[in-house]
From Swiss-Prot:
Lineage, broadest ranks: Bacteria, Bacillati, Bacillota, Bacilli, Bacillales
A Pfam short name: HAMP
Main location: membrane
Keywords, ordered alphabetically: ATP-binding, Cell membrane, Kinase, Membrane, Nucleotide-binding, Phosphoprotein, Transferase, Transmembrane, Two-component regulatory system
Reactions the enzyme catalyzes: ATP + protein L-histidine = ADP + protein N-phospho-L-histidine
Entry EC no(s): 2.7.13.3
Record-annotated Histidine kinase domain positions: 189-409
Modified how: Autophosphorylated.
Membrane topology classification: Multi-pass membrane protein
Residue span, HAMP domain: 11-63
Protein name, UniProt field: Sensor protein kinase WalK
InterPro entries named among the record's database cross-references: 2-comp_sensor_kinase, HAMP_dom, HATPase_C_sf, His_kinase_dom, HisK_dim/P_dom, HisK_dim/P_sf, PAS, PAS-like_dom_sf
Function: Member of the two-component regulatory system WalK/WalR. WalK functions as a sensor protein kinase which is autophosphorylated at a histidine residue and transfers its phosphate group to WalR.
């Protein structure tokens, strides 16, 4: 009897302890859902109850941790900045999609690789440098795509002072970098374009002050050059003001529906009359009316710019300007081609002619009185009309300027418009 009673008494003690041991093993595997059976209200029962409460709290804490982790993963995934997290040795453990996109890499390319190697800054920095330097810096992280990023590093440090890892945040500043370069280049160009005529005018005025005004042959020439340079500065300032208005969207568009055939023919007629027999104008324009919604004044400026350039750069012996207008009925758009028979443009410079202040031949352009802004303004106006402008050229074979605009063919109940 004593042995039997001893067995049952021992079992009432060992069974709950065995259950708690099994539950501890389950918890070590990450399973917090099971509970220990409570056999009584004695000390072992209270221990089992406390164990269950502990298990419940750990389960809740684990659930909160998982929830926070998912939330953090979601934030990192959808961030507009790139994020890389490393271990204490600098090996990448976490990288979001934006960082991969900015770096032009796949996940497999960065797995367990050193962050300094991935960012290609291992020659300039060490982990100790990043630890000591809290300032951000600019790096070219993807040369092929031309992506420039501002990188901010932070060190993950435990309460004990032990370094646990590093975090790098990549902010794409490519557009700001390009805009800043364009701004500097623009200011430099404006300064140069204003300084050149001012220097020339100053020289002539000083010569006149020193007595050149008494020379009946020299004085008129000096005054004429001064007037021409003044006119060029006025044109430059006016062009700059127009570009400024377009950039700030304060330039009002007064659009109206017009017959484009009549519109373009009127412009060509004006240039034909002013040029006389010096220039041959060839027209390939449909008779049926093509209607466009445009600002007539601004689009007149566009075609005047393009036609004037075509005349300027055509062959001196026999200037010829061709006009070809074609409609794409599928997309309700038309293409205007204005072609000259001039000196042409090198292939590597064709795409740059619409840049502000760009000139293929600077000396010749200045001699002809150009500001270097005409085609830039032309492009802004065309794009404001939901159109597109581009050029095609070969050296010695002339240049073609193409302009596409939205259009419609409207049936006129009174008959076709006479172009």
């Amino acid at each position: 009897i004593t042995i039997v009673l001893g067995f049952f008494i021992a079992r009432t003690i060992t069974k709950p302890i065995s259950d708690m041991r099994n539950q501890t093993l389950e918890m070590s595997k990450g399973n917090y859902t099971q509970r220990v059976k409570i056999y009584g209200n004695d000390e072992i029962g209270e221990l089992a109850l406390s164990f269950n409460n502990l298990s419940k709290r750990v389960q809740e804490a684990q659930a909160n941790t998982e929830s926070e982790k998912r939330r953090l993963d979601s934030v990192i995934t959808h961030m507009s900045d790139g994020v890389l997290a490393t271990d204490r040795r600098g090996r990448v453990r976490i990288i979001n999609e934006m960082a991969l996109k900015m770096l032009g890499l796949e996940c497999a390319d960065v797995e367990a690789k050193h962050i300094l190697d991935i960012l290609n800054i291992d020659d300039d920095y060490s982990l100790d440098d990043l630890q000591e330097n809290n300032d951000s810096f600019i790096i070219d992280i993807n040369s092929e795509e031309g992506i420039i990023a501002r990188v901010n590093f932070s060190t993950i440090i435990q309460d004990t002072g032990f370094i646990n890892g590093y975090i790098a945040v990549l902010h794409d500043v490519t557009e700001q970098h390009i805009l800043e370069n364009e701004r500097r280049e623009f200011v430099a160009n404006v300064s140069h374009e204003l300084r050149t005529p001012l220097t020339s005018m100053r020289s002539y005025i000083e010569a006149l002050e020193e007595g050149a005004w008494r020379d009946p042959e020299v004085a008129p020439t000096f005054l004429n050059v001064t007037r021409e340079e003044t006119d060029r500065m006025i044109r430059l300032v006016n062009d700059l003001l127009q570009l400024s208005k377009m950039d700030s969207s304060s330039d009002q568009m007064n659009s109206e529906l017009i017959n484009f055939n009549m519109f373009i023919n009127k412009i060509i007629n004006r240039h034909e009359m002013s040029q006389g027999k010096n220039v041959t104008f060839i027209r390939d324009i449909p008779v049926k009316g093509l209607f466009v919604e445009i600002d007539p004044d601004k689009m007149t400026q566009v075609f005047d710019n393009v036609i004037t350039n075509a005349i300027k750069y055509s062959q001196e012996s026999h200037k010829r300007v061709e006009f070809h207008v074609k409609q794409n009925t599928l997309y309700n758009r038309m293409t205007i081609q204005i072609k000259d028979n001039g000196i042409g443009i090198p292939v590597n410079k064709v795409d740059k002619i619409f840049d502000r202040f760009y000139r293929v031949d600077k000396a010749r352009a200045r001699k002809m009185g150009g500001t270097g802004l005409g085609l830039a303004i032309t492009k802004e106006i065309v794009e404001a009309h939901k159109g597109r402008i581009w050029a095609s050229s070969k050296e010695g074979q002339g240049t073609s300027i193409y302009i596409t605009l939205p259009c419609e063919v409207m049936e006129d109940e009174f008959g076709d418009w006479d172009a």
